[in-house]
Amino acid sequence: MSKRDFYEVLGVPKNASDDELKKAYRKLAMKYHPDRNQGDAAKPAEEKFKEAKEAYEILSDAQKRAAYDQYGHAGVDPNMRGGMGGAEGFGGFAEAFGDIFGDMFGGARGRGGRQVYRGNDLSYAMDVTLEEAAKGKEAQIRIPSWESCETCHGSGAKPGTSAKTCGTCQGSGTVQMRQGFFSVQQTCPHCRGTGKIIPEPCTACHGQGRVKKQKTLEVKIPAGIDDGMRIRSTGNGEPGTNGGPPGDLYIEIRIRKHDIFERDGDDLHCQVPVSFITAALGGEIEVPTLQGKAAIDIPEGTQAGKQFRLRGKGIKGVRASYPGDLYCHIIVETPVKLTEHQRKLLKELDESLKKGGAKHSPSTESWTDRLKSFFS
């Protein structure tokens, strides 16, 4: 099957400028890229993608474009003539999409064709108390950090020597690897994308140009921060490669288990034990809050599980306008290790209460009635 005209493939006139060619190619490549076309549309899209790639690689090269304009496909197809050299893999693709796909996959082109990479992000786990999380705090942390080697001033080469241009990639930092129909541009395995080879590495940094040290950072923990939240420290991650920007440091907050309170969002919960005498007769008890002590009036006849709400005694979250509440859950404590005299008094009380029936123990009486109905 005869090939379509390359200008027709890209949808541009024969006098199209380089910018018009690039714009047309980018539009087609984005439309027919394999990642965007799945299922039944995958095969036709792949053919369109290859066709557009080949057309752009020929027309974006001044020498190949001139040969194509004069001789047509025969001027650029090595299978149709003695070999003027065909398309060179993804060269045109990388040129047209370097700024898009480079960012997507973490790499970009620096000057001289060297791969520029953003540094990796780092993570740090910080333990704080509930009180510190509620009020906020400033803290110092020490993290491992890569710094420029003082011996070689970051060059990686032994003092008095210098790095040489990589002979494998000719300083570009990348090599062409053919995979079936495609030629894929990959990081040079010899120089690892730096474009340079160091014949005599610096003994202090072993040719890396940087050494690992401990760095102290001031961290501000905002009031109301919750467990699992992260604080980003911009630019304090690992340094980039070949002049790339550094990554970020993410500090993950872990709130230690508290002896009294449990946090639920901006609210706090605590279990408050009271004696069965206080629960029966009522009274005032003292409970702790993050702001200090508070009093609760226990009404007469309070049952286990009763919940008392203290408004505004919780935590004001990072994005909240008002603080949460404190919920006190009552636990009626049963006395233990009774003396004989105490046992006698309780038995007398029990007999007296039984005579009152539902008057004194409505829940027990109701439960007894339901049991009788169930077994009848």
From Swiss-Prot:
Subunit structure comment from the entry: Homodimer.
Subcellular location: Cytoplasm
Domain notes: The J domain is necessary and sufficient to stimulate DnaK ATPase activity. Zinc center 1 plays an important role in the autonomous, DnaK-independent chaperone activity of DnaJ. Zinc center 2 is essential for interaction with DnaK and for DnaJ activity.
GO terms, molecular function: ATP binding; heat shock protein binding; unfolded protein binding; zinc ion binding
Biological processes per GO annotation: chaperone cofactor-dependent protein refolding; DNA replication; protein refolding; response to heat
Function noted in UniProt: Participates actively in the response to hyperosmotic and heat shock by preventing the aggregation of stress-denatured proteins and by disaggregating proteins, also in an autonomous, DnaK-independent fashion. Unfolded proteins bind initially to DnaJ; upon interaction with the DnaJ-bound protein, DnaK hydrolyzes its bound ATP, resulting in the formation of a stable complex. GrpE releases ADP from DnaK; ATP binding to DnaK triggers the release of the substrate protein, thus completing the reaction cycle.
Disordered, as annotated region: 227-246, 354-376
Protein name in the entry: Chaperone protein DnaJ
Lineage, uppermost ranks: Bacteria, Pseudomonadati, Pseudomonadota, Betaproteobacteria, Burkholderiales
Binding site for Zn(2+) 1: 149, 152, 202, 205
J domain mapped to chain residues: 5-72
PANTHER family in UniProt: CHAPERONE PROTEIN DNAJ, DNAJ HOMOLOG 1, MITOCHONDRIAL-RELATED
Cofactor: Zn(2+)
NCBIfam families found in the cross-reference section: DnaJ_bact (TIGR02349), PRK10767.1 (NF008035)
GO cellular component annotations of the record: cytoplasm
SUPFAM superfamilies documented for this protein: Chaperone J-domain, DnaJ/Hsp40 cysteine-rich domain, HSP40/DnaJ peptide-binding domain
Ranges of compositional bias, category Gly residues: 237-246
Lineage: superkingdom: Bacteria
Biased composition annotated in UniProt, kind: Basic and acidic residues: 367-376
Co-factor remark: Binds 2 Zn(2+) ions per monomer.
Binding residues for Zn(2+) 2: 166, 169, 188, 191
CXXCXGXG motif repeat start and end residues: 149-156, 166-173, 188-195, 202-209
Keyword field: Chaperone, Cytoplasm, DNA replication, Metal-binding, Repeat, Stress response, Zinc, Zinc-finger
InterPro entries assigned to the protein according to its UniProt record, in alphabetical order: DnaJ, DnaJ_C, DnaJ_domain, DnaJ_domain_CS, HSP40/DnaJ_pept-bd, HSP_DnaJ_Cys-rich_dom, HSP_DnaJ_Cys-rich_dom_sf, J_dom_sf
Segments forming CR-type zinc fingers: 136-214
